[in-house]
Amino acid sequence: MSTNQIILTDQGDNYVNVWSHVAQDLYNHYGETLYNSWFSKVNFIESSLNTVILCAPTNFVRDWIKSKYSMVILQLFQHYNNTIKSIEIITKELPGTTQTVTELPTKTFADIGSSELNSENIFSTLDARFTFDNFVVGAPNELAYAAARAVAESSGAVSESNPLFLYGGVGLGKTHLMHAIGWYIKQHNPSRKVIYMSAEKFMYQFVKALRNKEVISFKEKFRSVDVLMIDDIQFICGKDSTQEEFFHTFNTLIDNNRQMVISCDRSPSDLDNIEDRIKSRLGWGLVADVHSTTYELRLGILESKIEQMNVKIPKDVIDFLASKIVSNVRELEGALNKVIAHSNFTLKEITLENTQNILRDLLRSNERIITVEDIQKKVASRYNIKLSDMSSSRRLREVARPRQIAMYLSKALTPKSLADIGKKFGKKDHTTVMHAIKKVEELLENDIELREEINLLMKILQN
């Protein structure tokens, strides 16, 4: 049992106190703006039969919290009281004690003392929305997902993927997988000490420890864990002192068979302004990339989110979002949330026309939209072949492979059907395009160099 968990068995004032802790955690995690928008007017009403009852000020706030934050709130309550099994959010207050938490002090890094530096609690740094159960798996992320799952399920032993290095563009799921690892371990192996934090926060805590002469405490905190997860490691590029400390922390953990998980926006070999000895170590274990989403994966993500939020969205709207919002998962989910929120606020039906109007600014940025012709030109230039080779029937490998890659990218980055794509490649039929896509997907499973090449092409085309 975690030493910082508060176990309460009675009701009344104790639960009011727990709600105060939960509210503080929500404030710390989501920030002042979001907290004031959704949580500041929520009241604790009572607890009954292991259920906590909260009161929201309006039906809309109630429904929004239920759809997006109910699991977060439940897990926070369970952190302080493991007898709580569910929460209920109502809009009509019941008789009894109520507690509203409205103004909470912001806790800055400067306020963190040595006792907090040594805290084993990672709960407040994990987002309960990010679990393995709600991670949608597809060809672009299946290796990263399988590796993350293996790390989480290693039951105290170090996985073969040590360190596990996840890399890819913004909003593609790297952070989701790291949070999922943390949640899984805390739920199934609560005795294991886990730390998750960004590389930026790692640096700030190191600087703070130097300033306050608490370096020993800092080293003990990070070198005594069972699992250390550092997000966005590219942040330490060019920061020599932080790199030095990270290097020794890395060595200590690996030498003691402790697991490390690291994320980055590029592969270890592409990192600049970082020591070669660190770059080499980052590639010791499994390097798994999370590349840009396909139409099918975007469709699956949308359907999963819609099911979680228990809303009804017309099929043509879902298809439109999956076809048009191609940059990353974060932007895709944000677009869906914006459409739903607009409908709730205005009480207007969700239609394709309304969706196009609501998202017109976002669509404009995505509509630098990549055409099949753009892809053909870029791939032909990249592989030094003639543009006319894209529509030819030449079977030479140096021509056929770039053509297959261009077909794969056309499916991933445009809303065109297989038949339409085939027409752009010398009037080839849809089965030829399907074969090309399948061939590239098979190659991507084992060819790291090809994955990096396609990721680079996607970034060039999208930017």
Curated annotation (Swiss-Prot):
Region (Domain IV, binds dsDNA): 344-463
Region Domain III, AAA+ region, annotated ranges: 125-343
Gene3D superfamilies in alphabetical order: 1.10.1750.10, 1.10.8.60, 3.30.300.180, P-loop containing nucleotide triphosphate hydrolases
Keywords (A to Z) from UniProt: ATP-binding, Cytoplasm, DNA replication, DNA-binding, Lipid-binding, Nucleotide-binding
Gene Ontology CC annotation, any one: plasma membrane
Signal peptide as annotated in the record: none
GO molecular function: ATP binding; ATP hydrolysis activity; DNA replication origin binding; lipid binding
Region (Domain II): 83-124
Region (Domain I, interacts with DnaA modulators): 1-83
Subcellular localization: Cytoplasm
Binding site for ATP: G171, G173, K174, T175
Family, as annotated: Belongs to the DnaA family.
Chain's role: Plays an essential role in the initiation and regulation of chromosomal replication. ATP-DnaA binds to the origin of replication (oriC) to initiate formation of the DNA replication initiation complex once per cell cycle. Binds the DnaA box (a 9 base pair repeat at the origin) and separates the double-stranded (ds)DNA. Forms a right-handed helical filament on oriC DNA; dsDNA binds to the exterior of the filament while single-stranded (ss)DNA is stabiized in the filament's interior.
Entry text on domains: Domain I is involved in oligomerization and binding regulators, domain II is flexibile and of varying length in different bacteria, domain III forms the AAA+ region, while domain IV binds dsDNA.
Database matches in PANTHER family: CHROMOSOMAL REPLICATION INITIATOR PROTEIN DNAA
Protein name as it appears in the record: Chromosomal replication initiator protein DnaA
Record organism: Rickettsia peacockii (strain Rustic)
High-level lineage: Bacteria, Pseudomonadati, Pseudomonadota, Alphaproteobacteria, Rickettsiales
